[in-house]
Every structure is written in structure tokens, then in C-alpha cells.
Swiss-Prot record:
Its EC number is 1.12.2.1. Binds 2 [4Fe-4S] clusters. Binds 1 [3Fe-4S] cluster. InterPro entries: Cytochrome-c3_hydrogenase_C (IPR027394), NADH_UbQ_OxRdtase-like_20kDa (IPR006137), NiFe-Hase_small_C_sf (IPR037148), NiFe_Hase_small_N_sf (IPR037024), NiFe_hydrogenase_ssu (IPR001821). Its cofactor is [4Fe-4S] cluster; [3Fe-4S] cluster. It comes from Megalodesulfovibrio gigas (Desulfovibrio gigas). [3Fe-4S] cluster binds at C252, C270, C273. The keyword Nucleus does not apply. GO terms for biological process: anaerobic respiration. Its main location: periplasm. Belongs to the [NiFe]/[NiFeSe] hydrogenase small subunit family. Residues 1-23 form the signal peptide. [4Fe-4S] cluster 1 binds at C41, C44, C136, C172. One of its GO terms (cellular component) is periplasmic space. This is Periplasmic [NiFe] hydrogenase small subunit.
Amino acid sequence: MKFCTAVAVAMGMGPAFAPKVAEALTAKKRPSVVYLHNAECTGCSESLLRTVDPYVDELILDVISMDYHETLMAGAGHAVEEALHEAIKGDFVCVIEGGIPMGDGGYWGKVGRRNMYDICAEVAPKAKAVIAIGTCATYGGVQAAKPNPTGTVGVNEALGKLGVKAINIAGCPPNPMNFVGTVVHLLTKGMPELDKQGRPVMFFGETVHDNCPRLKHFEAGEFATSFGSPEAKKGYCLYELGCKGPDTYNNCPKQLFNQVNWPVQAGHPCIACSEPNFWDLYSPFYSA
């Protein structure tokens, strides 16, 4: 119930909604998830694997039914291909991690001799909902940075012509609670309200700057001038060191990672990792 309360609060519903979360996640048939990998570093899966409330074993065995995930599966080769084909016969949520290479006919990204676009095009349109997890899946990520030789794009750009409208859980990596909260919303209330970038407003409705614990220093004109400076040690605002918090929509200051910490609290400027094309638009990441 502690986890259900945390999810309810993250969704903006308050602790009173926790029983509904519990009901959705303890149904006889747990929500089936088919998780596809494309051009990425697996950092989004790493973030999910390192969640502590619940731990990943509880998450994939008790909360959701992870019926296909190439990183977690014990099988390989033909057996895994068969598992995918069986999983997409039923009612499932498709989660896509990583950008989709479209250049040269999809040559730059293949699994089992099939290109990543073809696999996603087979699976995603059959799902009752599609979630693009991480900035690579949502906007292309680092693979799409100039000059983008592989022609990598986000899920909606690649699959939109097939009628796919993915929910974008942006971030590099995203907070796993934003993913779980989205699944819960789909189960209890249907499609969440999305912003113009396709992100759930309940998680991406405010800027990092709006909720930053260093905001008082920004308003007072108190800025860290260099890393390791006395001002930095006092927790002064990191804006002059390159912080992109005013331009970045995410709930990092509220949700933290594993409810423990987040980059700005640890002394590192926000790099706008949940924004479209952040590798190109927001480089260089440091001003010092």
C-alpha cells in the first residue's frame, strides 16, 4: 500500500486514491507489457531495474506482467521471437525504449535480421496503448543529434502514419515512477491528459525551475559561479553554470529518483534531458 500511495501522489490524486491503484495492480489479470528495444543505451531499463519501492522483482512479477523484455529474458533466438509473437496475440501495453533508425531503409538497427522499424510497426498498432519511455524513444535522443547519420527519430514520428499515438515519458533516463504512474492511469482512468509534446501533464506540467529547492536563491540573485565554489557549497542557484531548469518540464524536484536525490540537489545543473532535441538545442551543457 505504501507503493500505491506513492504512485497516487505522483499522479496528483493524493493518498485517498491509493486503494484504486491497489485494485488496478492486484487484479486477477495483471497488465501485460511488451517492452521493445531500439537505438538506446538501456539506461531507461536500468532506471526501472533500480526502483526500490517496489523492487524490480515485485514490479515485474506482482504489479505488471512483463511478457517480453530482451534485457530481462533468459531465453534467446527463436524462443524469444516466439514469445513475442505469443505476447502480442492478447491485450497488452507496448513500451518502446530507444529511437527508431529510419535511414537507409532501417539498415542501422536490426534484431534477428529484422529492422527495428518493422518490428515496432508489427507490434505497436496491435497494443491497447503505446508508451515511449525515455528521450530516445520520445524524440530520438542522442542518436538523433546532428548529423544523425542513422536517421533516428522518435516513436510518434516513425509510427504516426500507422495510427500510433504514443504517450511520451521523456527523460534521460526517466523516473520509473512516471512510467508506473502512467500504466496505472491507463488502467484506472484511461488515457492521461497530454501536453503538446505528448507527455502526461500530471508528471510534466511544471518546469524544474518552478519547484527547484534553489529557486529562492535565483530570486535573490544568489548564483554559484563555479563548481566547488563557496556559493555552490551553500546551495546557491546553478543557472549561471548552465542550468536549463527554466526551460525543462519534468517533476524531478518533486519525485526525486527512488525518493532520494536528483541532479540539481546533488550539485549538477539540469541539462533539459526531457525536452525535444536537447542534445542539439541545449549544448553546451555547462556555462562555467
